[in-house]
């Protein structure tokens, strides 16, 4: 049967209300969806429009006030887009190119730029390398590591690519059938990961008569 779910999520002591997306984004949480074409990007809009979209809509950035009137700060938008295009190596003709015409890897980089433009404290990234080429995978993963180590940003990656997770993560949580089974280090044996992905905590397997190497 169904059970009532309860609990709360706090970020730096502030409780987050996930029924109010705007308040969560304003609190410093950003997400890069695995469905970049469905929900991650506005495919018929330019790269620069995509990058600043959330920051403009949620935080009111990239707008200039003239008395009772508000005007888009096109110069600042262009400068911001060019900075991200350079830092993330987005291969394009320029900031005005439509996002729908980019390769999968470059679309993913635009999604990351869009999230970073919100200056988040906490970044969720779902399947960051799905559907992109090897070179783009390397750059995307290196970018996520740099955000954590150089900017102190907390980055949570959800991925089915275990070896990729091992190469960039400090610790890896294994979830099976909706439940947290274990949290392992990247150096843990593959056998432990195999057990955890089957829903068995490695330490419990040993207690029940399994072998330890």
Language-model features: where?
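Glycine-rich phosphate-binding loops of nucleotide-dependent enzymes
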Residues: 1-213
């Amino acid at each position: 049967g169904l059970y009532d779910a309860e609990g709360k999520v706090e970020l730096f002591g502030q409780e987050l209300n996930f029924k109010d997306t705007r308040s969560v984004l304003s609190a410093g949480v950003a997400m890069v969806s695995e469905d970049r074409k469905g929900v991650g990007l506005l495919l018929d809009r330019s790269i620069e429009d995509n990058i600043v979209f959330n920051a403009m809509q949620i935080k009111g950035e990239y707008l200039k006030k003239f008395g009772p009137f508000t005007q888009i700060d096109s110069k600042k938008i262009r400068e911001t887009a060019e900075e991200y295009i350079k830092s993330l190596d987005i291969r394009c003709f320029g900031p005005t190119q439509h996002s729908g015409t980019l390769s999968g890897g470059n679309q993913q980089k635009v999604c990351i730029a869009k999230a970073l433009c919100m200056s988040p404290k906490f970044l969720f990234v779902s399947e960051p390398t799905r559907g992109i080429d090897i070179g783009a995978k390397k750059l995307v993963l290196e970018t996520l590591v740099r955000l954590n180590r150089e900017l102190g940003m907390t980055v949570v990656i959800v991925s089915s690519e275990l070896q990729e997770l091992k190469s960039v993560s400090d610790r890896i949580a294994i979830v099976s059938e909706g439940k947290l089974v274990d949290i392992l280090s990247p150096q843990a044996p593959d056998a432990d990961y195999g057990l955890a992905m089957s829903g068995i905590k490695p330490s419990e397997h040993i207690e029940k008569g399994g072998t330890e190497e």
